[in-house]
Amino acid sequence: MKHQETTSQQHNFSIIKHGDISTPQGFTAGGMHIGLRANKKDFGWIYSSSLASSAAVYTLNQFKAAPLIVTEDTLQKSKGKLQALVVNSANANSCTGQQGIDDAQQTQTWVAQQLQIPSEHVAVASTGVIGEYLPMDKIKTGTEHINDANFATPGAFNEAILTTDTCTKHIAVSLNIDGKTITIGGSAKGSGMIHPNMATMLAFITTDASIESNTLHQLLKSSTDHTFNMITVDGDTSTNDMVLVMANQQVEHQILNQDHPQWETFVDAFNFVCTFLAKAIARDGEGATKLISVNVSGAKSISDARKIGKTIVSSNLVKSAIFGEDANFGRIITAIGYSGCEIDPNCTYVQLNQIPVVDKGMAVLFDEQAMSNTLTHENVTIDVQLGLGNAAATAYGCDLSYDYVRINASYRT
């Protein structure tokens, strides 16, 4: 399929129509059904034709799953170099002890043998039910098909990493660096157990840009802090979260770092990809009907702005009110008040879908019908101005519907 581009407003990059994880030069991706799920795809992979500078950030849950432990160790041993990633859904390989570690490493070995690369250049990831061992006979079957062109489509990869997601999440953008066109692609999964810091979510980013691993890690950490770490669905933090980026340097240009004259252009495009994927995850929250964006400004510090935003979007009462299309702004100011951050009610201003509801800590009369009409929209925005400083942040989440309980009450059955 020929990719089409549209220029993103106010940005120096273009969004590639139908762009995906394998749009950057030198990358392929694929996926297939190996029997971990009843009939859906459950095993996927990404491969770069050349060694790629790589970096990853991981869950803060202390019960870190085996594949994350193995991948983190792999990146340390390889000094931030990867050439392939393999991921399975339906089984988290978490709380599986040494056998889980051994199974993840065996998966690495099988993939490396098929691709004829060192095992320390293979990352592994898993998502799904916690506490069950991987059926290694099925995993081996998957690894044996990595070179099979019949399964080598990015769409198959996008499907293979899903669990309770209702849709795939992918994007690619292109930009000009040193007169050369470079591309950044991304794919993610996540629907339930989404909460800062990074919850049951996996995100993978590829680029054909030339950039070193240490610079890539700094960029990924910075971007994750205000994108993936600013989303919440249900307040639970998973054992398997990971965001991983690979840059295979297929496009030759001056090495990108903070001293490059177009560094900020690259950062802008990279952040856009991360933000797009993070919002797609929040929008696809289990049972969700609305995406909630909370913009906090005027905070004393960036940490306060982030914490207040996340507190509001994590509130079950706020989420329930949005689902019910009820302009109950009292739940918003209550969340602000118990956030633990420095606030002054007399300086606080709140808007719901651009309609003022609180001014200097006092309720503002508003047209109930006009407000009700805006709350039927799929996108709901809460703006909070604290009037204390210059720090700002945005958090993303979704409403809380009846379907959330239905989905999670029967997750293992």
UniProtKB/Swiss-Prot annotation:
Primary localization class, coarse = cytoplasm
Q: Which CDD domains match?
A: OAT (cd02152)
Question: Which annotated residues bind substrate?
Answer: T163, K189, T200, E286, N408, T413
Q: What is its EC number?
A: 2.3.1.35, 2.3.1.1
Alphabetized, the UniProt keywords read: Acyltransferase, Amino-acid biosynthesis, Arginine biosynthesis, Autocatalytic cleavage, Cytoplasm, Multifunctional enzyme, Transferase
A GO biological process of this protein is: L-arginine biosynthetic process
Q: Give the top-rank taxon of the lineage listed in the UniProt record for this protein.
A: Bacteria
Matches recorded under HAMAP family: ArgJ
Its biological purpose: Catalyzes two activities which are involved in the cyclic version of arginine biosynthesis: the synthesis of N-acetylglutamate from glutamate and acetyl-CoA as the acetyl donor, and of ornithine by transacetylation between N(2)-acetylornithine and glutamate.
The protein's name is Arginine biosynthesis bifunctional protein ArgJ
Name the source organism.
Staphylococcus aureus (strain MRSA252)
Gene expressing this chain: argJ
